[in-house]
Curated annotation (Swiss-Prot):
Record lineage: Eukaryota, Viridiplantae, Streptophyta, Embryophyta, Tracheophyta
Organism: Oryza sativa subsp. japonica
Protein name (record): Probable protein phosphatase 2C 37
Region (Disordered) residue spans: 1-90, 406-434
InterPro entries in the cross-refs: PP2C, PP2C_BS, PPM-type-like_dom_sf, PPM-type_phosphatase-like_dom
Biased composition (Low complexity): 57-77, 420-434
PANTHER family registered for this protein in UniProt: PROTEIN PHOSPHATASE (PTHR47992)
Length: 474
C-alpha cells in the first residue's frame, strides 16, 4: 500500500523493502527535496533524536534529478510528485530562473543603428541642428528608448541649437513623470474615462507594447509648459524659430512628432511611408536642372491599389497656412494668411506651426502632429531630414537610395563615399559635411549620399539628414 503525503510516496512496512531499507529510502528522498544546508541540519537532528518526527517539505521545494551515484534503494523509491497542488520539477526550476530583461529582448529583436550628415549647402549660415541620443531614457520594463531629431532654424541658429541641447532632456523628464503616474493609475476599468478627459484637455499619444494587455506603457501629452528661455532677448529673440521632427524608438513602437516642414519617412518593404505632414504651403511645381516635377496632394496606395497613407510624393500638405481649418484658426485669433510666393502667415512665415517665432504668436503655434507606428519585420530604415533635402528629393527616391546603401554598403565603401561627398561639397564652394555620431558606417554613407544628391540638385537651403537602420545589418 502506498500513501501519498505532500507529494512524496511513502512505502509502508508491508512492502518489498525491510524497515531498514525503508528508513534509508526516506532519508535519501528527503535529501533530494531539501536544499543542501537544510539536509545537513536534518541529518544531524535525526541522528540526535533517534529518527524522530520528520519535517514536512514545502510544496514549492525543487526536485532535481537524481544524481548518477544514487543508490538502488533511492531509485526504487523515487517517483513523480502528485497533482495535489505541488509543482513539477520543471515548473519549480522555471520559477527559480530569472526571466530575460525587457532591455535585452528588445535590443535583440528591434535593433537600431544610425548615422547623420549636416551641410550648410549654398547658405552662408548653418541654421540646422541634429540630435542623436541613443538610450537617452528607459522604458518601464527596462528597454532602451532612442531619440533622434532634426531641427531646421530660421532667422538664426539659436532656437535649433537650443532644441538640440534641451529637447531630449525635456522629453526624458516627461517620460519619468508620466511613468511614475502610470504606476499609480486607476484600474483598467477607469482607463477609457481618463483618456476621454485627457483628449478634451490636449493631444494624447499612448505607447503600449503588446496592446492593451501589454506589460506597461507611457503616456505622452502635448502640454502647455513654461518654455526654455533663450539667451537672446528683445526683437532679435522674437524673430527666430525652428522646425522639429523627432522620432522615438522603443521596442516595437516608432513615435514621430513633427512641427514645421522637416519630415520623417519610413521605408517599409521597399515603399516609402511618410510619418509626418509638412506644416507649410504646397508649391505648384518644383524644378531642378530644367526638370519639372509635378506634385499633388492625396493618398498613396499599396500594390493592391488600396489607399493606405499620405501621398508618397507629398512634399507638403500638412497644417499649412491655407488649409481650411488652419486658416480658420489663424483668422480666429486675429491673424491672416497672405499669398506672397505661397501662403504665409502675415505674409512672412510659410509655416503655420513652428517653435519660437514669438512675433507671430498666437497665429503660429508649436503643437505637433504625432503618429505612432508599430514596427514590423518589413521595416528597413527611417529617414529624418530638413526641407533642404525634401525640397529636391521625393520620398520614393530618398527611400530607394537609403535602402540600397544599407543593403550594398560596407564600412570601407561607406568611408570612401563620405570622403568623396566632402570633396564634392568643398569643390562646390560649400562647407564640408558636419558628421554626426557614426554608429554604423552604412547609415552614414546613406545620409552622405542623400545630402550629396540634394546638393547636386541645387538645393538652396541647409541640408541635414539622419538615416536609422531598422534591420541591424551590422
Amino acid at each position: 500500500m502506498v500513501m501519498a503525503s505532500a507529494g512524496v510516496n511513502m512505502p509502508g512496512g508491508d512492502g518489498d523493502h525491510p524497515p531498514a531499507a525503508a528508513q534509508e529510502c526516506h532519508r535519501l528522498r528527503r535529501r533530494r527535496y531539501v536544499p543542501a544546508a537544510a539536509a545537513a541540519s536534518e541529518d544531524g537532528d535525526n541522528s540526535s533524536n533517534g529518527g524522530g518526527e520528520k519535517r514536512s517539505l514545502p510544496a514549492s521545494s525543487a526536485s532535481p534529478s537524481p544524481s548518477p551515484t544514487s543508490s538502488a534503494a533511492s531509485s526504487d523509491c523515487s517517483s513523480d510528485r502528485d497533482d495535489d497542488g505541488c509543482s513539477s520539477t520543471a515548473g519549480a526550476a522555471a520559477r527559480r530562473l530569472p526571466l530575460p530583461s525587457g532591455a535585452s529582448t528588445a535590443a535583440a529583436v528591434w535593433p537600431v543603428a544610425f548615422g547623420s550628415v549636416s551641410l550648410a549647402g549654398r547658405m552662408r549660415d548653418m541654421e540646422d541642428a541634429v540630435s542623436l541620443r541613443p538610450s537617452f531614457c528607459t522604458w518601464l520594463d527596462g528597454s532602451p528608448m532612442h531619440f533622434f531629431a532634426v531641427f531646421d532654424g530660421h532667422g538664426g541658429p539659436h532656437v535649433s541649437a537650443l532644441c538640440r541641447e534641451q529637447m531630449h532632456v525635456i522629453v526624458a523628464e516627461e517620460m519619468v513623470a508620466e511613468a511614475a503616474a502610470l504606476r499609480q493609475r486607476q484600474p483598467a476599468a477607469m482607463e477609457e474615462e481618463e483618456e476621454e478627459r485627457a483628449v478634451a484637455g490636449g493631444a494624447v499619444a499612448e505607447l503600449r507594447p503588446g496592446g492593451r494587455a501589454g506589460g506597461g506603457g507611457v503616456r505622452v501629452r502635448a502640454r502647455h509648459r513654461a518654455g526654455v528661455p533663450c539667451p537672446l532677448s528683445g526683437q532679435t529673440g522674437a524673430i527666430i524659430g525652428s522646425t522639429a521632427v523627432v522620432a522615438l524608438l522603443v521596442r516595437d513602437r516608432l513615435v514621430v512628432s513633427n512641427c514645421g516642414d522637416s519630415r520623417a519617412v519610413l521605408c517599409r518593404a521597399g515603399d516609402p511611408l511618410p510619418l509626418s505632414s509638412d506644416h507649410k504651403g504646397l508649391n505648384p511645381s518644383l524644378s531642378w536642372r530644367g526638370t519639372r516635377v509635378a506634385l499633388a496632394r492625396g493618398t498613396w496606395g499599396d500594390k493592391t491599389g488600396q489607399s493606405v497613407g499620405p501621398a508618397a510624393l507629398l512634399l507638403s500638405g500638412g497644417a499649412h497656412p491655407d488649409r481650411p481649418d488652419e486658416k480658420a484658426r489663424i483668422e480666429a485669433v486675429g491673424g491672416r494668411v497672405v499669398y506672397l510666393n505661397g501662403p504665409r502667415v502675415r505674409g512672412i512665415l510659410a509655416m503655420s506651426r513652428a517653435l519660437g517665432d514669438k512675433y507671430l504668436k498666437p497665429e503660429v503655434i508649436c503643437e505637433p502632429d504625432i503618429t505612432i507606428t508599430v514596427r514590423t519585420v518589413d521595416d528597413e530604415c527611417l529617414i529624418l531630414a530638413s526641407d533642404g533635402m525634401w525640397d529636391v528629393i521625393s520620398n520614393e527616391t530618398a527611400s530607394d537610395v537609403a535602402r540600397q546603401c544599407l543593403e550594398d554598403g560596407s564600412p570601407t565603401s561607406g568611408r570612401r563615399a563620405a570622403r568623396s561627398g566632402e570633396a564634392a561639397s568643398s569643390s562646390a564652394g560649400a562647407p564640408a559635411a558636419a558628421v554626426g555620431q557614426e554608429s554604423e558606417p552604412r547609415c552614414y554613407r546613406a545620409a552622405a549620399l542623400l545630402a550629396r544628391l540634394a546638393l547636386g540638385r541645387e538645393s538652396s537651403d541647409n541640408i541635414s539628414v539622419v538615416v536609422i537602420d531598422l534591420k541591424g545589418r551590422g
